């Protein structure tokens, strides 16, 4: 009888302990945000989709606020397609040391020039690398998470896109992100 009572007590304790797990994180709204890019070729602004891509935007904002992007180059530029940056190694192989899950929203599409999206190596492998489209690219929908749109300075983005590149689409003259400033607007 004591053995049965002891077993029942242990089962109750075990069940109680499983209920002590971490509560799932709740998304917290962050409000509007604009990323101001200052490069050696000029400046442009991107309105971040904080209301539809909260986690992706929060990751980007955190990296920008830490100065992660300061001094990083646009390492891949393909005219009439996109410009890509965010690799600390400058060659498309690096990241922040972690990955984030893909975050898709039905209203966020690669349907125009100036769309900001996460670069990746496959599903759920985004981190710090991003690209900005130079045209509509619907084949990227559902594969790369959109999280913003250029609102000012698209001529600078186009100018970067027209950079002369080598066989690996790397600009011959470095295009450097001097700083990304996040403004609450």
Regions found by a protein language model. Name each.
Residues 5-185:
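Cyclophilin-like peptidyl-prolyl cis-trans isomerases
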